[in-house]
Amino acid sequence: MLNFVILGGTMKFAKSAGIFAVILSLASMTAVWSAAAQDQHKAQIDALRKSLEKYQDYKVAVRDLYLSTVGCIHYSGEKIAGHMEYAKGAMGVHFVNLTVKGPPDPMKPNVLIYEPVGKKLKLVAVEWLVPVTPETKQAPTLFGQTFMGPMEGHEPLIPKEFVHYDLHAWLFKDNPLGMFAATNPKVNCKGYDFELLEKPTRMMHGH
């Protein structure tokens, strides 16, 4: 009887050890896949950053049909039920290219974002704005990131009827909240002639 109990315990231990080994193997494979995906995204992001360097001069952006919405947007961190949650910080001055349409192109964001620094504008981030249409089935993704939304347009700069998804990428300024966060606490709108403290945008459920 004792031998059976010991043998049974050994069998259980071996079975548990086998399951544990499988779990470790799967975890290792997942880590490898994740690292490979991150490397791929990093290569894409590095290529994107390099291709956009020319827009450090906002006049080049304007010539390429990125038009300024003038206001420097920032948020207080206020939370309102049914609205997007934006951490305290700024988004900056948006330059929108209305000629860029269709599914989000990782190498062609339709928004460039600048921070006013003294009398100049410094390129700090980019954004992809994707309007919600009857054909939209789910939130888009880029670089392994799911777009935020759907939400109304950011009044007064964008009509609230412009229901959309968006994704920011802070390619040219470090963001302690993360590269793909909507706001950046290191971006400053204070002293800018067209400083706009916005309320969080209303979420649009059911789209």
What is each of the regions a protein language model found here?
Residues 32-37:
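Boundary at the C-terminal end of the N-terminal hydrophobic targeting segment
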